[in-house]
Amino acid sequence: MDIINQLAGIEPGGRLDEVRNLRPKAKQNAQATFTALLEPEDTGAFSYAERYAVAAFVAGLFQVPAAAEFYLDLLGDAAADDIVAAVRQATDRGATRGPAHDAGFVTFQDIDGADARLSAAFDFAHLLVFHPQDARPAALGHLEEAGWDADGIVSLAQLIAFLAFQVRVVHGLRVLGGKGDSAGNAAGANEAANVTEGESAGADSTSPGWHVAGDVIVPEVHAPEGFVNHSLGWKPWIPAVAKEDMTPQQIDALIKPERVDSEYFRLLARDPEALRARTETDLDIFYNTDGGMARAERELAATVVSRLNGCAYCASVHQARCVDEGGDREVVDRLLDEGVDTDLGSDYWSAIRNAAVALTRTPSEFTAKHIDAVRAAAPGAAAVSPGTESAGHADAVVIDLINCSSFFNWANRLMLTLGEPDVPRRFR
């Protein structure tokens, strides 16, 4: 069973299933990531009940009803009624809008039925869902003080960040399939509608009282001043696996052997099955050029999402790739300097930007009008007729846009909450 197809209401062998199959490894490995994070053979200290509780909470916060109901059903099969009630109570409390920066923290220590580990996981999840740019090393210290070890923290971050991808793909495909604009109707949506972006019903303060603890690292970095058009380094807040300690399974999960030199990938290798599936998903979404969207526009979507979420590291990487693939240097610099509302110089790039921004917001603001605008502006995709080869191409462009935008809601959350960017000496 393909979970994304199920939640999006896509019939096996149907039109959208066939278009999704243009990115077969992305489709297969999105499912493999679900298995690695929700149904692993060895859960370690991160139990199935905890995984389902976090997933149900996160899906509820993202306000995509099909996903929220699915994960609540999984939780109900694996946990006691008091845990299900705790998730519902926490979801109602956490309702807000995002992405935000310098936002109030919402904490969940007093949720009935949630122990210290689960409450801390909810605290961390709320941060990742709505304002990951506000993460600091103390957020990981808070998890360690509640009993989470480094491996568990990486798996927890991967689970939350993966769901940020999955629910956006589901919502985008539902809109593409004409099943309505389903976001914003899950538990807590009414409360969220009454909260301005960057605030939260029940927000405690901008300082939740968390502390650096255990194995958490506060690295010495030269932080970038804003968004830059040169490369950046990145340093983790919990120890990466040392090169000499990498197991064959962890090395295999890197896919690209040269990534053993990256602390980021050696950190994610603490959960090798999730890393492998995530990497295969990434590579197929961005580098499989069998139809669909051109490479420059895929990288544009990644840069827009990273700019909106506040991820300077990801923006630095993908702005360069956008330009390398033919993107306009001046326009990309303007995006970095001025933000996502800047003039991008063409109807097509503006339509991509608008769709990527709408998909990134919580609750999602992505609707059929964004699809229509992309179709109308895409080269060779204007005035298509349903059921034609041109219509299939237009759908492939839209699915690439949905996948790229959704994936960077995954990538940004890992980069922003497990470590921080560092300006190389040559650029200081």
Task: Give the residues covered by each predicted segment.
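Hydrophobic alpha-helical segments
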Residues: 1-428
